[in-house]
Amino acid sequence: MSVVALGATSITPPHGPESQGRPFPARGPVRPSARARPVPLWTYGYSEGTSRAGRRWG
C-alpha cells in the first residue's frame, strides 16, 4: 500500500516531486545495481575467466 501510494504520488505530480522523485529512485537502483554487478562479474570471472579468459590471455 505504501509503495503504491508513493509511486502514484511521484507519478501523479510530475512537477515538483518529479525532480525529487527521480533522484530518490535513481539512487536506490544505482546502489543495488553497483553491488549486484560486482557479484556476477566475479562469478563470471571465476567460471568463464578460468576457461575463456585463460585461453585468451594465456
UniProtKB/Swiss-Prot annotation:
One biological process term in Gene Ontology: response to antibiotic
Domain of life: Bacteria
Region (Disordered) location: 1-37
Keyword terms of this UniProt record: Antibiotic resistance
Biased composition annotated in UniProt, kind: Low complexity: 25-37
Protein name as it appears in the record: Curromycin resistance protein
Species whose genome carries this gene: Streptomyces hygroscopicus
Gene responsible for this protein: cre
